[in-house]
Amino acid sequence: MAQAVEEWYRQMPIITRSYLTAAVVTTVGCTLEIISPYHLYLNPKLVVQHYEIWRLVTNFLYFRKMDLDFLFHMFFLARYCKLLEENSFRGRTADFFYMLLFGATVLTGIVLIGGMIPYISETFARILFLSNSLTFMMVYVWSKHNPFIHMSFLGLFTFTAAYLPWVLLGFSILVGSSTWVDLLGMIAGHVYYFLEDVYPRMTGRRPLKTPSFIKALFADDNVVVAQPPNAGIGAGARFGAIGVDPQAQ
């Protein structure tokens, strides 16, 4: 069993493995009280006035306490991060890293701007960690790249992957969870998808071209990946209590 887990871990692509490792280490460290979540959460005042710049990164690494919900989040993170890195971004590690960096920037910007708008500022002030939103962004981008994959919600009904983010959002509403996390991830994912996939087809220009200094950090081969219209890829488990599995083709 241990050997199988080790092999599974070693076979992960570099970005997925690094992010998953950082998330697990951070959450375990907080659970064991080695570090405190109060030193990790997003606080614009502390970032600007006290130069605690690390909060811009650490708020994406903490997934709350270790419980069943945490395990589902880690499964979701590992699955969709890996699917994107190995398929849509195969041979383009720098582009994938830039996607995550762009998504994190958009999410942070939304929270900062929302915190300055009357009537909704209190809602955004309660958003301390954006790790779940970044994971949801990856789900959204994956669904846009694989819209025709057939999926099943707990065997109750089937749908195509294009509707996966909306199914998960509906489940959050059904169980009474906050939908802000999902909505922020969907917004960031759609902004990225539009600028990277839709806008270039409309204008011939690519505004999100990965900077050369980021490309220099990764040794990639140029690989063109053909995406099949249908593939046996499931959604895994929903945050906390939901299973979404592929429908047999």
Curated annotation (Swiss-Prot):
Associated with ER-derived protein bodies in endosperm. It comes from Zea mays. PANTHER family: DER1-LIKE PROTEIN, DERLIN. This is Derlin-2.2. Pfam families: DER1 (PF04511). Its main location: endoplasmic reticulum. May be involved in the degradation process of specific misfolded endoplasmic reticulum (ER) luminal proteins. It is found in: Endoplasmic reticulum membrane. InterPro entries: DER1, Rhomboid-like_sf. Residues 1-21, 118-122, 174-249 are cytoplasmic. Induction: Not induced by endoplasmic reticulum stress. GO terms for biological process: endoplasmic reticulum unfolded protein response; ERAD pathway. It is a multi-pass membrane protein. Expressed in roots, stalks, leaves, immature ears, embryo and endosperm. GO terms for cellular component: endoplasmic reticulum membrane. Residues 43-96, 144-152 are lumenal. The chain crosses the membrane at residues 22-42, 97-117, 123-143, 153-173. Belongs to the derlin family. Keywords: Endoplasmic reticulum, Membrane, Transmembrane, Transmembrane helix. One of its GO terms (molecular function) is signal recognition particle binding.
